[in-house]
Amino acid sequence: MSLYLGLDSSTQSLSAILLEVDGKRRRVAFESSIVFDEAFPHYGTSHGVLPDSDPATAASPPLLWVEALDLMMTKLVESGLPLGQLAAVSGSAQQHGSVYLNAGASSALASLDPGRPLVDQIGGIFSRQVSPIWMDSSTGAECRAIAAAVGGDDTLARHTGSRAFERFTGPQIRKFATHEPEAYARTDRIHLVSSFLASLLAGRHAPIDPGDGSGMNLMDLALSTWWDAATSATAPGLRAKLPELAPASSVVGPLASYWQVKHGFPAARVVVWSGDNPCSLIGTGLVREGRLAVSLGTSDTVFGLMQEPRVDTTGTGHVFGSPTGAYMGLTCFKNGSLAREHIRDEFHLSWPEFSRILAATPPGNGGRVFLPWYEPEITPDVPTAGVHRYGLQPGDRDGHVRGVIEAQMLSMAIHSAWMGVAVDTIHATGGASANREILQVMADVFNAEVYQFEVGNSASLGAALRAAEADAESDHAPVSWEEIVHGLADPVATSRIAPNSTAAALYANMRAVYSACEAHALGRGPVPAIGNVAVGMSDD
């Protein structure tokens, strides 16, 4: 019997899943989460983020993550599980966030004292006391400068998988180097959150895997190497400050003596960590093409495995490395639950009432189209909020209920087509995935079977599964990814929702109508026509 630990350091919490593997029998033996604000109020964070007078700036204290890691390992010991059977540990972390260390970090990591709390030993290793995170949007000027230096956003996207994004690590590094040049000069190593936490476990600088490295605007996606043009355009001497890149199944080394002596852990393998999105790819069982995951949350996200890297020419999608050695595509939509809840509240509905109306309204919504951009949208790029109606009157309750869901599903299908994936199965996650009426529209629009997927933390589960896969590979007994995820990252078999062939055909034709409405709303096309008749419009 072997145990595999998966950790996930998100914006607001640190979660852990411990898998017990005994031949073909596998189960989750331990699951826990530490909410940062509750466990460590002395850092003064709100939802894991430090307060700032600039709403575009978002950062967290890296010592918070250090203290959380030490506490989680203590909780594991207190569980009473046979941790002597721990074979490997890996992790997931919020993507794009960066940690800045000085030249004293290497010796500090290698000489951790098990008699002292971890947080008390490494406070002096930071050249920057805060870590900018994915919520930061303050680097527009840096994005433009980097893109211009490498030949434009199209060139940057072809090489790195994404155009320059404010939250990505490269623009954040450029801002730091420009505004705090002396602190940047004192910086010896710039880690991602994932590689920093892996370094704490291994007691040495850990590499970055291609999955998380591709969220930096710095890595050549096809070669899995740092792209010199991007590193040079970002900051002077940056290449020497970056960790090495290594495959996702690489072993950094054994758990450092700090963990072995203080907590009694064995010399388990520390597997390279990755980002939360690549780990969630594994945790939701997306290990072959043809499957997509749709997360229906505050924001809606579509992601899936791609065997070859393809780039979204509109510049809104992302390509990351996959732990399987292939690639993953991801597209995010900001107006997710916000838009659904807005319609529910505007018409004073309960969720059961919302669902009944949705089920009773015919597919296609009688030609009525609704664009629910209550907030500036990520996909498509809508910088100014505003809703748009085509053939839909403001007081039409039923039309708005179906209109908001059809708009979201059509937008997902249209704006994820760049991935080039022939979809046969969708794993639906997130709060709204409990609504089968919404999932029926999803099945019809994508013309694919939809399954509900019940997993508390797909990122930490994916990290634990990655640890198991890397451990098998290190023992020269590799196991297929299908076998790795089977039984642990499967959707609910009885939740299958099949597409209605008539509705699927209608939505296939409706994509062009929706695209025309979207183009008009964005000022890129004429007033759309449905059945050769220009539709009436109203905007908020």
Label each residue range with its predicted role.
Residues 119-125, 141, 235, 302:
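Glycine-rich loop(s) and the adjacent beta-strand/alpha-helix scaffold that form part
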Residues 1-120, 260-269, 443-450, 520-532, ...:
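N-terminal glycine/serine-rich phosphate-binding loop of ATP-dependent small-molecule kinases
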Residues 52, 56-57, 77-132, 162-167, ...:
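Short beta-strand-loop/turn "lid" adjacent to the catalytic site in phosphate-handling enzymes
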Residues 136:
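Carbohydrate-associated surface elements
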Residues 34-36, 247, 499:
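Active-site donor-binding loop signature of nucleotide-sugar glycosyltransferases
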Residues 49-59, 154-163, 498-499:
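Short glycine/proline- and acidic residue-enriched helix-loop micro-motifs
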Residues 5-7, 15-20, 83, 144-160, ...:
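Active-site core segments that coordinate phosphate-bearing ligands/cofactors
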Residues 241:
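Short beta-strand elements in bilobed, periplasmic/extracellular small-molecule ligand-binding domains
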